[in-house]
């Protein structure tokens, strides 16, 4: 059981999406992709939540909260997004972990 599950929180996942050239997209394209994602999230219901995403040159790394990997794959399929790798976050660390 992860720390989040012990605290009664939804599991958290990092999704790696291979999207060549995505880092060159402009604000309008990113807005459209975000709107598509949010539309699918609304259809799937409140049990899946998009936290945020990191856009790099050729990949997007998304952080989601969801009860399972399956619903994340469903979101990707419905939205037309790749989900090349999905991993569950076991715990988080930051500089305060060193204290």
For every predicted segment, state its role.
Residues 46-52, 85:
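A short linear hydrophobic-aromatic micro-motif
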Residues 13-17, 50-76:
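Short, well-ordered beta-strand segments in beta-rich or mixed alpha/beta enzyme
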């Amino acid at each position: 059981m992860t720390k989040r599950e012990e605290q009664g929180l939804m599991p958290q996942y990092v999704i790696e999406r291979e999207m060549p050239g995505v880092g060159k997209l402009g604000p309008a394209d990113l807005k459209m992709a975000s709107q598509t994602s949010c539309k699918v999230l609304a259809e799937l219901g409140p049990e899946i939540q998009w936290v945020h995403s990191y856009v790099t040159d050729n990949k997007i790394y998304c952080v989601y909260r969801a009860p399972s990997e399956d619903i994340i794959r469903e979101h990707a399929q419905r939205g037309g997004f790749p989900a090349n790798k999905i991993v569950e976050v076991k715990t988080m660390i930051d500089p305060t972990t060193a204290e």
